[in-house]
A protein has these predicted regions:
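Conserved phosphate-binding/catalytic loops in two-lobed NTP-binding clefts
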Residues: 40
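N-terminal beta-loop-helix "entrance" segment that forms/cooperates
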Residues: 44-50
């Protein structure tokens, strides 16, 4: 319900809201019972930060073996530190490198409780909420995207509720391992 409510106040997104409502009407005309459900807005806002925290930490941990000695690309560097640095930097995009840096920070001993373990708690809260939905309903129908694709030079406030919820709610499936399908 909250995901659709955020969309409905924005004139630019009226077409998406109307298309989504048409899909709901079509489902109902096919005999499906459709009910709006609510999720705590704070949990919806926490999806993206929790997802980024956990995924960056896991990416860093899962790729820690890329030393250039046994795994990873081998280089002709002269010492082990240079070999490891080369194996962990060459061949990765800037985005992947940023994720590794963020993941390393998250996994540092002094940050694990505050960042990683709290993100895992948030993930459990979200999946617990979803599991409660699935005790009562067979599935959830959500908009697949918040808006049409933005222009390359469009500014986007990545800390706004709209961004944190509308562009990232599909990560819920990753948290709980729920099957999903996106239908155009």
């Amino acid at each position: 319900k909250e995901i659709l409510d955020i969309n409905s106040d924005n004139e630019e997104l009226c077409e998406i809201v109307n298309n989504f409502k048409e899909v709901i009407s079509k489902c109902e005309s096919l005999g499906m019972e459709v009910f709006p459900v609510s999720m705590d807005i704070n949990l919806l806002k926490a999806i993206y930060p929790a997802y980024i925290t956990i995924s960056c930490a896991e990416a860093t941990s899962n790729n820690a073996n890329l030393t250039g000695i046994i795994f990873g690309s081998r280089s002709d560097k002269e010492n082990i530190n240079e070999m490891m640095m080369d194996a962990r930097t060459n061949g990765f995009s800037e985005l992947i490198k940023r994720r590794f840096i963020l993941g390393s920070y998250i996994l540092q001993k002094e940050n694990q409780e505050k960042l990683y373990l709290n993100a895992c708690r948030v993930r459990r809260m979200i999946t617990s909420c979803m599991n409660e939905f699935f005790k009562e309903y067979d599935g959830l129908i959500l908009p697949a995207a918040a808006s049409v694709a933005p222009l390359f030079d469009a500014d986007k406030d990545r800390l706004s509720d709209e961004y944190l919820i509308l562009d990232n709610h599909l990560a819920i499936g990753n948290f709980g391992g729920y099957p999903s399908i996106t239908i155009p």
